[in-house]
């Protein structure tokens, strides 16, 4: 329970007090819980996250000032309307997810102590993949089993998969806020004008590839297992169709665990995370399985390309 005096009280389901009152520097305005994690956002934009089970916090209190464009607004000589917080949520790992009225969506990194932007209106008007999912990928994937061979029905109950749906939620908020503010029509006209201009022939393609890369990175950041798998295959299909040899080679090397490894480089004792990790699974998926599916997609694109050449 949150009170006007800036205190937060926690009780058990039976009504017993679990901990002493938690005193904040301002009145709580947004609260959310996910599992044992409790999120509290107060009136001055400070975000607190507590683990009620371990009576600890994954990171110090963090301010919403960076995502509210405080730095940009302070440099202007006149008063401007700043974005408002539409919702604040927690994922299964206790990570803060925030959606704003300007269409931006952010997540706070507990490891790097920084806000990361996961969604923005720019992708909505320039990407061919906005509000879409490649059904040809999702329907032909050979398996949806994880490392332990269980079905997706069982995976939905596991904590690592509770982040599923966060990226579509943020993108839907981006679409809604862009339409409400009337920006979508103006930006779409601007992009259409650029597409027919000389020198911008590959503009839409570049934005679409960048949007898929943003989706893959966001899914990895949030630990969204099923979405990472889908977006990765969509990305592999797109860069294969674009003929981006350097990106294809780097993607294959990263799936094998040696994306930035040089022949003359000495072994580093410090272990990397994400794409920098040399071994282990990627967001709950075995690297060998992901590599096999990516190679299968690239092989189909290559065979289709060779058939077209023979027909010509």
Task: Annotate each language-model stretch with its function.
Residues 1-86, 108-129, 308-312:
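WD40-like beta-propeller blades
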Residues 133-312:
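C-terminal scaffolding/assembly regions of large eukaryotic complex subunits
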Residues 92-95, 100-142, 146, 154-165:
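Acidic, small-residue rich beta-repeat scaffolds with periodic aromatic anchors
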Residues 48, 106-108, 113, 129, ...:
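Sequence-level detector for tyrosine residue identity
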Residues 19-23, 30, 39, 80, ...:
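Short amphipathic alpha-helical molecular recognition features
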Residues 1, 8-11, 40, 50, ...:
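Long, contiguous hydrophobic alpha-helical segments, chiefly transmembrane helices and signal peptides
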